[in-house]
């Protein structure tokens, strides 16, 4: 009986010798896996933190920043020079007495010059100055910035339609040539280098409500 117990004890001891390295190996593998997982999570966390930090450092530009960038880019890197020729002034007959419109000038003789470019989206940006005869046949200068979103319905893209705005400053004789800020709608139809552009000056009865159009030639 004692011999049998001794044999069992030796067998148990030998089994333990074989099992201990196995447990050690499994423990090492688990430790390595846990370490790798921790490193991966730490790396992902660092990457997320860096992206969040970059987002906080580089916020989307504001409207004024975009406007300033567009003005600067148009002035410093124009793609074309433009000749402006005033074409027509029309006083809205539904908002004027005939006695008024009969004596108003609707032939805005004058000229202007500007620079322009197309951005990466194909939209139009311009800086310009222009002078023309106003409704009282007096000289009226205007200058500013123009923007149009452009559409090209044909495959050859020679014909373009534009819709946007112009912001600038004008001066009139009947207002003693005091600088007056203006913000007006802008629309155009273009064929290759020639554009017919127009704006509408809103107003009240017998005041404002004027359609003003001009030709623009790129060279």
From Swiss-Prot:
Amino acid composition bias (Basic and acidic residues), ranges on this chain: 49-59
Domain of life of the source: Bacteria
Signal peptide: 1-28
Region (Disordered), start-end ranges: 39-63
GO biological process per UniProt: lipid A biosynthetic process
Site feature Role in lipopolysaccharide recognition, where: 100
Short name of one Pfam family: PagP
EC class (word): transferase
Gene Ontology, cellular component aspect: cell outer membrane
The protein's Enzyme Commission number: 2.3.1.251
Site annotation Role in the phospholipid gating: residues: 205
Active site (catalytic residues): 91, 134-135
GO molecular function, one term: acyltransferase activity
Compartment(s) of residence: Cell outer membrane
Keywords of this entry: Acyltransferase, Cell outer membrane, Membrane, Signal, Transferase
Catalytic activity from the UniProt record: a lipid A + a 1,2-diacyl-sn-glycero-3-phosphocholine = a hepta-acyl lipid A + a 2-acyl-sn-glycero-3-phosphocholine; a lipid IVA + a 1,2-diacyl-sn-glycero-3-phosphocholine = a lipid IVB + a 2-acyl-sn-glycero-3-phosphocholine; a lipid IIA + a 1,2-diacyl-sn-glycero-3-phosphocholine = a lipid IIB + a 2-acyl-sn-glycero-3-phosphocholine
Broad class of the protein's primary localization: membrane
Protein function: Transfers a fatty acid residue from the sn-1 position of a phospholipid to the N-linked hydroxyfatty acid chain on the proximal unit of lipid A or its precursors.
Sequence similarity: Belongs to the lipid A palmitoyltransferase family.
Subunit details: Homodimer.
UniProt-recorded name of the protein: Lipid A acyltransferase PagP
